[in-house]
Amino acid sequence: SGMTNHGKVLKMAPRGKFGEKVDALGLAKVAGVDYIARLAPTNPARVARTVRRAIMVAREVGHSYIQAYTSCNIEYSIPTPDVMKDAFEIEKERYGFEEIISPAAKAYLDEVEKKPKKKKSD
């Protein structure tokens, strides 16, 4: 995994992870991706908003990339009830929410998001 620390011994890397982390956000930025986000699943509304924004930009402006941290409770032997606790800790330590938005994508999102939302009719 590109998010696993160098040297970490895991089932998928029994001798320790030999490669350094890949700066996927940096690669996306250099590649000119229009909407880039990093997030952990600690805030469901933010996850939904981020995915919605990425899809809208991909449909109308250009490429989107989301890097989402998910606790691998099997690989790291995290008990299922502690998965969200792990996600909050990782988010605080090194995986805070970040968005990188191109000027074209920002203009599009500003325009779309200022429109009044349609109400569902019963």
Language-model features and meaning:
Residues 2-22, 83-100:
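Acidic, Ser/Thr-rich peripheral helices and adjacent loops at domain boundaries
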Residues 7-57:
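Conserved thiamine diphosphate
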Residues 50-122:
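Glycine/aspartate-rich loop-and-adjacent alpha/beta segment that forms the canonical ThDP
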